[in-house]
Amino acid sequence: MGPLVEATEFSKEQALTDAAENLLKPHFSTDATLSLLEVMESLLATVEQDLSSSVQKALHPPMRALVSADLLRNPDSDVRVSVVSCLTEIMRITAPEAPYNDEQMKDIFQVTIEAFEKLADASSRSYRKAEVILETVAKVRSSLVMLDLECDDLVLEMFQRFLKIIRPDHPQLVLVSMETIMITVIDESEEVPMDLLEILLTTVKKDSQDVSPAALTLVEKVLSSCTCKLQPCIMEALKSSGTSLDMYSPVVSSICQSEFATTQAHNDVKPKDNEADEKISEGQVVPSDSLEDKLNLGLSRKGTRSKRSARGGTRRANGDEKVITANEGLSESTDAETASGSTRKRGWKPKSLMNPEEGYSFKTSSSKKVQEKELGDSSLGKVAAKKVPLPSKVGQTNQSVVISLSSSGRARTGSRKRSRTKMEETDHDVSSVATQPAKKQTVKKTNPAKEDLTKSNVKKHEDGIKTGKSSKKEKADNGLAKTSAKKPLAETMMVKPSGKKLVHSDAKKKNSEGASMDTPIPQSSKSKKKDSRATTPATKKSEQAPKSHPKMKRIAGEEVESNTNELGEELVGKRVNVWWPLDKKFYEGVIKSYCRVKKMHQVTYSDGDVEELNLKKERFKIIEDKSSASEDKEDDLLESTPLSAFIQREKSKKRKIVSKNVEPSSSPEVRSSMQTMKKKDSVTDSIKQTKRTKGALKAVSNEPESTTGKNLKSLKKLNGEPDKTRGRTGKKQKVTQAMHRKIEKDCDEQEDLETKDEEDSLKLGKESDAEPDRMEDHQELPENHNVETKTDGEEQEAAKEPTAESKTNGEEPNAEPETDGKEHKSLKEPNAEPKSDGEEQEAAKEPNAELKTDGENQEAAKELTAERKTDEEEHKVADEVEQKSQKETNVEPEAEGEEQKSVEEPNAEPKTKVEEKESAKEQTADTKLIEKEDMSKTKGEEIDKETYSSIPETGKVGNEAEEDDQRVIKELEEESDKAEVSTTVLEVDP
């Protein structure tokens, strides 16, 4: 069987070559030429699309011979018809690629349209050939190439010839082929030109005299099939001409009235009414049985049909595809004409990508303009791999594949764009075709009867060409996004559930065999949103509520629509949510304007997309702007709320912050910090009580007998009696315990005054680290208080140590704590004397000199030694103090921060030059005594004895003053015994 096939192929190749050579020879007889053309036509009819390299090579000479001037421009019409018959076979073989360049294709189409004239006379010699030509043009959809080549005049001429030559006695195949060609051209045009529309309307006009019934029937079928496309054009034409619907055939009235019926159906949301409207608008179609009889949609032996590549209105270069040319040198070219992606300027051209099974691509041989001067096997070698066989004429009865009436619909349902959307990128090199807003208002709707016919005959093929519709994606670039969010992935309405790839038309899927179009090209977000609104036939069947509205094909929801009476200028400026059926979601936009003539609203979506919609036919929601109302309410609330309420609210928030940072935690650090705070508060209260005590003792300190108190103080320091110390401590603890009850109240007062922020809480954490040091300080504080709260000893100490006291008085105005950070100093120094750390320790150690360590006793001894050396100077100072104390008795305290200063001022001696020198001497003496550590105990005992003896000399006071001092000392001793227990508890308290 193998050798026989090879022999057959070889003989076919040889026959094609011989026939081409014979045609190129000059012939003096028309009959001889016709005979050679008959042989050529029969040979070409046996060639399938799946070409071998040898057949491709053998096909080249016939292609060159058929476009020669002697044959294509032969004076005999029968010869020209025979040539066209051969050329249509070549177009079938090379589909979806155009076999010649643009100029040659235009010449071929011109001759083809002339050949249709032979259909007017059934008795003519070329009538049968004309029928075959018409059938082939319809099935391979070569009329789309005419649109791509901008052959507008040829299209108009073809329509006129069809209406002129059609006869009632024509076979149904002729009528259906004419109808198919006309519907294909209208549906695939971006905008139906007025000249073409005028031809159709003139035919269906009632007063037309020269229109045959067959032509009227043909036009009515075309109008009914293209209702969605022609409806707005017809309405506009009638308005511009001012003619009435009564002047035209009832089909025109039904087309125009279907718009109102559709509007009512959408507004009422009644699916049954929508179905009825669909029947009205699309019911006038050719009976399906006649189509099945005359159009056999059987598949070829390979189960595939001829296909065409997607072009989208612009020609592109494809280096992998070789197109056979027959221009004397048989040129092979790439797309040098529109390499820059320039688009055609005409407004009438194929609307979209076409389905490859249904005929030619928009790509023609003119896109390949590089002349081929060498013929090689490669000139035809790559064509066969890309062609899907169409049936040959050998034994062709019901095997011929004729283009279905739904082919244009299938092309639209695939990757072709909707009529009211802009052409977007759908392939590597395809440029977008700019369309006017007026061109974006309708979408093709496939006739249901034809759709059923198509699916019944090519069911297997349909299973593989479900085309996907991608859903709208919101913009994620340019930082807008305002959305950040976030973006829905592209949905597809395919049989396969995958929703992440954009599936183009079957043209691209089949062209991917050996070509570079096997990878889906992602579309822009705008094209995805717009494509998602196009409804495929499969989608229509899946919808529960089919609608006849040709423009939107929206799914009617159950929600309440807006009042149709208010869908005018009242909506301008309002924000709306518009329903997109394939995305199954609403998209937000703003109504920018309203056209009274078109009754269309211009909606600008949040992603920048602009669309003109008839909102009476749309499903949408008006978005109420509640933000302004809420803002006004908030402003009113702010204005009506008093300032005190906000302050109180802020305080409560800060309290909560402090409680969150302290209370929930049970760690030792937090507990210790809380104890530190409580102790700090108790010490603060003790400070206040000390001030009150000093105020009560002010009268005593103002007496001239203050020197007696000074002597008593020195005596207490020398003796260092523990009992007296404990008595003073017990008295102080008594006051402290009384003030503990007010801790919580004082804490609240401190919060209100200080309004601590988060930094204070952090400081509190840091203070907890230094808790051990503070604990020691707090344990020593009661003794410190005792030193400071001695009845009048503190005030009289200035007479004994004038330099130190004067220095203290000079610094006292700044003694009050200024910041929280300095608060711990004020706690250590109840009288707020700004002493250094060393001075604080010395002040705390002085009352308990004998109870401290040996080193502390040495320091106390050294200090007393320094006092002894300046004993004579102290006598002088004491006299001066007595004189000035009487003058300063009536001095009132100036401020709370200076209260301590006013208490000590009566006994204080202002610093003079002599005192400054004495202070310097005293400091020098102290420094020297510190270095003498070996004299600690011995000198201390001697100093004690000498001090006892010196008391009578310096303690010359009245009897009344001595009695008062003794009474105070006695009271302190009694209280010391009672407070001994509480003192022990305070020292042990953690």
From Swiss-Prot:
HEAT repeats lie at residues 31-57, 58-96, 153-190, 191-228, 232-269. SUPFAM superfamilies: ARM repeat (SSF48371), Tudor/PWWP/MBT (SSF63748). Residues 302-314, 727-742 have a biased composition (Basic residues). A motif (Nuclear localization signal 1) lies at residues 458-465. Residues 746-760 have a biased composition (Acidic residues). Residues 267-281, 421-430, 448-477, 503-512, 761-810, 819-890, 898-947 have a biased composition (Basic and acidic residues). PANTHER family: ANDROGEN INDUCED INHIBITOR OF PROLIFERATION AS3 / PDS5-RELATED, SISTER CHROMATID COHESION PROTEIN PDS5 HOMOLOG E. Belongs to the PDS5 family. This is Sister chromatid cohesion protein PDS5 homolog E. It comes from Arabidopsis thaliana (Mouse-ear cress). The gene is PDS5E.
